[in-house]
From Swiss-Prot:
Quaternary structure (record): Part of the 30S ribosomal subunit.
Signal peptide, first to last residue: none
Keywords linked to the UniProt accession: Chloroplast, Plastid, Ribonucleoprotein, Ribosomal protein
Classification via Gene3D superfamilies: 3.30.390.140
Family: Belongs to the chloroplast-specific ribosomal protein cS23 family.
InterPro entries the record matches: PSRP-3/Ycf65_sf, Ribosomal_PSRP3/Ycf65
Cited NCBIfam families: PRK02724.1 (NF002740)
Domain of life according to the entry: Eukaryota
Broad class of where this protein is predominantly found: plastid
Name the UniProt record assigns to this protein: Small ribosomal subunit protein cS23
Gene Ontology cellular component terms for the protein in this record: chloroplast; ribonucleoprotein complex; ribosome
Organism placement in taxonomy: Eukaryota, Rhodophyta, Bangiophyceae, Bangiales, Bangiaceae
UniProt record, GO biological process: translation
Amino acid sequence: MEIKNLSKFTLKVLWLENNIAIAIDQIVGNGTSPLTSYFFWPRNDAWEELKAELESKPWIAERDRIELLNKTTEVINYWQEEGKKHSLAKAQARFPRIYFFG
């Protein structure tokens, strides 16, 4: 699934050995502005925390929230199933429109 509204938002993922942390930035002009803090998985329930954060911002369209949460699910599932075995570079190749750091 491709994020269609990448011109509005981008996911950022901190790729760690025992956790991942996911945040959303808003695209503003040629740069980005943090929209959320980082939410950790599996230390905390990053998906639920991110969902609550997005729902607290009524100006974000429902379809945008759904797309961002679906992509978050894909990243979490990848990390759980395969990612712990793979490098940051492989994760970036798997999700080229998401920013990975580690």
